[in-house]
Amino acid sequence: MRHRKSGRQLNRNSSHRKAMFSNMASSLVRHEVIKTTLPKAKELRRVVEPLITLAKTDSVANRRLAFARTRDNEVVAKLFNELGPRFAARQGGYTRILKAGFRAGDKAPMAYIELVDRPAAEEAAE
């Protein structure tokens, strides 16, 4: 029985899921917008939002926790130096999911997941 088991399996084993979401979270923090399938985007929210909340309080312990989840020093630096201060006044809801139609090959529902309050220069570049 799967009572009280939260999260999607996404046809992957647990280590593959953990690695995939770690990589996707790093990409989202680095680029601030990524395109992926809708179910992956919805699950990615559950990984990224706690990371940003962690980054709002800068401490060595929090930096180590963030590094343990992302395994990328550049991403940890951006989280604590840019995103933490940017979202200091916001209590959650740091990401936005925009539906982007269906993929040509297999009709999988696609979506953009982005950080809210992105700088205007990045939006103009896209």
From Swiss-Prot:
Q: Which Gene3D superfamilies match?
A: Ribosomal protein L17
Q: Name one GO cellular component term.
A: cytosolic large ribosomal subunit
**Which keywords are on file for this protein?**
Ribonucleoprotein, Ribosomal protein
GO MF terms here are: structural constituent of ribosome
BP term (GO), one: translation
Query: Which is one Pfam family of this protein?
Result: Ribosomal_L17
Sorted alphabetically, which InterPro entries does this protein's record hold? Ribosomal_bL17 (IPR000456), Ribosomal_bL17_CS (IPR047859), Ribosomal_bL17_sf (IPR036373)
User: What's this protein's family per the entry?
Assistant: Belongs to the bacterial ribosomal protein bL17 family.
Tell me the subunit arrangement.
Answer: Part of the 50S ribosomal subunit. Contacts protein L32.
Q: What is this protein called?
A: Large ribosomal subunit protein bL17
Tell me which species this is from: Vibrio parahaemolyticus serotype O3:K6 (strain RIMD 2210633)
Name the gene that codes for it.
rplQ
